[in-house]
C-alpha cells in the first residue's frame, strides 16, 4: 500500500481499438477515488494524445498527486477506467513497460537507497527500479545520464549520496531520471519544488525544450504555480472542487470540515483556461492573471 491509501496494482489489459484510440497516450474515464468512505476525486475525465504537452493545474490538496499515482501505474481508481499507452490499469503486468513512463515526483525520490549515487539513480530509469541492485548499465547509458545532469546544471553531484542532496538538487536528479529512458509518457510532478531562483530558471529553460520538441512523447507537468509553467506547453487540465447539486450528492461522504471532492473543471488551451475569473473561483480568492514574455503569473486584487 502506498502513501495516502493508494494500493499499487500489478496488472493491465491490452486495449484493442481504432486508429484514434491508438493515438491516445492517456485516458481517464469517469475516474473516482475513495479513501475509506471519503470521496477524494470524482468524475475525472481527461484524454491526452501522443505528442501533446499538458499542464495539470490546481490548488494543493485537490487530488493532483492521487492522479499522478494512477497515471504512473502506482495506484488505481475506485471506479472508472485509466488507459495508459494502450493498457488498461488493473489488468496486465505493469513492470514489462513501466520504463516507458518517465516519472519525477517527491514520493519517488524517497524510494532510493540513502547512499545511492545520483548518477546511478538516473540510470535506473532504464530498468524501472529504484536502486542499482544487480542491474548493469553501459558506458553509453552513463554518458547519457551525465549529459542530462549537465543540461540541468547538476553535473557536480556525481559521486555524492542521495540523502545528502538538498530538495532542489534531488528534484533535478529526478527530472533527469524521468527523461533517461526516452519515455513515451513523461509525468513531472511539481518539477521545480525546492529550487532557488537560479535553479528554477535553469530547469524551466530545459523543460521549455521538452515542451517544444516534435515527437510522439506525451508530457504532463503538474503544478500549482502559474509562474512555473515552461513555454511550449499548450494544453491544460484545471482541477477544482465540485459545487452545487453535485457537491450535495456527496455530502454524506464528506466528514466534518473536509472539502468537497476534486475533479477536472476545464480542459483545453492555456489562453482560454487561465482566466482571472476561473482561477479566482478555483482558489476562492480574487486573482488577476497575466501573461507576458511567454510566462504566466497571478496576484491577488
Regions found by a protein language model. Give the residues of each.
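Catalytic Walker B motif of ABC-type/P-loop ATPase nucleotide-binding domains
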Residues: 186-190
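The feature captures the beta-strand-to-loop junction immediately N-terminal to the Walker
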Residues: 57-59
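Conserved ABC transporter NBD signature motif
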Residues: 80-90, 97
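ABC ATPase nucleotide-binding domains
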Residues: 269-301
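H-loop/switch region of ABC-family ATPase nucleotide-binding domains
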Residues: 223-224
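Helix-to-loop junction immediately C-terminal to a conserved catalytic motif
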Residues: 72
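ABC-family P-loop ATPase nucleotide-binding domains
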Residues: 108-164
Amino acid at each position: 500500500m502506498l502513501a495516502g491509501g493508494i494500493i499499487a496494482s500489478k496488472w493491465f489489459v491490452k486495449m484493442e481499438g481504432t486508429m484514434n484510440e491508438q493515438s491516445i497516450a492517456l485516458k481517464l474515464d469517469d475516474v473516482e477515488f475513495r479513501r475509506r468512505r471519503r470521496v477524494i476525486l470524482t468524475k475525472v475525465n481527461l484524454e491526452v494524445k501522443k505528442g501533446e504537452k499538458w499542464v495539470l493545474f490546481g490548488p494543493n490538496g485537490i487530488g493532483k498527486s492521487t492522479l499522478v499515482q494512477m497515471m504512473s501505474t502506482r495506484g488505481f481508481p475506485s471506479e472508472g477506467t485509466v488507459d495508459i499507452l494502450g493498457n488498461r490499469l488493473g489488468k496486465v503486468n505493469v513492470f514489462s513497460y513501466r520504463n516507458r513512463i518517465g516519472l519525477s515526483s517527491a514520493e519517488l525520490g524517497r524510494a532510493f537507497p540513502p547512499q545511492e549515487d545520483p548518477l546511478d539513480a538516473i540510470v535506473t530509469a532504464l530498468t524501472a527500479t529504484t536502486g542499482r541492485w544487480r542491474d548493469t548499465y553501459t558506458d553509453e547509458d552513463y554518458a547519457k545520464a551525465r549529459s542530462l545532469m549537465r543540461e540541468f546544471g547538476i553535473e557536480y553531484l556525481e559521486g555524492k549520496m542521495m540523502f545528502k542532496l538538498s530538495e532542489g538538487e534531488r528534484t533535478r536528479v529526478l527530472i533527469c531520471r524521468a527523461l533517461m529512458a526516452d519515455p513515451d509518457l513523461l509525468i513531472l510532478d511539481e518539477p521545480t519544488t525546492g529550487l532557488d531562483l537560479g535553479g528554477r530558471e535553469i530547469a524551466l529553460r530545459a523543460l521549455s525544450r521538452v515542451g517544444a520538441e516534435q515527437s510522439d512523447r506525451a508530457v504532463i507537468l503538474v503544478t500549482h504555480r502559474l509562474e512555473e509553467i515552461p513555454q511550449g506547453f499548450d494544453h491544460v487540465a484545471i482541477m477544482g472542487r465540485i459545487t452545487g447539486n453535485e457537491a450535495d450528492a456527496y455530502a454524506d461522504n464528506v466528514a466534518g470540515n473536509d472539502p468537497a471532492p476534486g475533479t477536472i473543471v476545464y480542459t483545453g488551451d492555456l489562453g482560454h483556461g487561465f482566466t482571472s475569473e476561473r482561477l479566482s473561483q478555483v482558489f476562492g480568492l480574487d486573482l488577476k492573471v497575466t501573461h507576458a514574455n511567454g510566462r504566466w503569473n497571478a496576484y491577488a486584487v
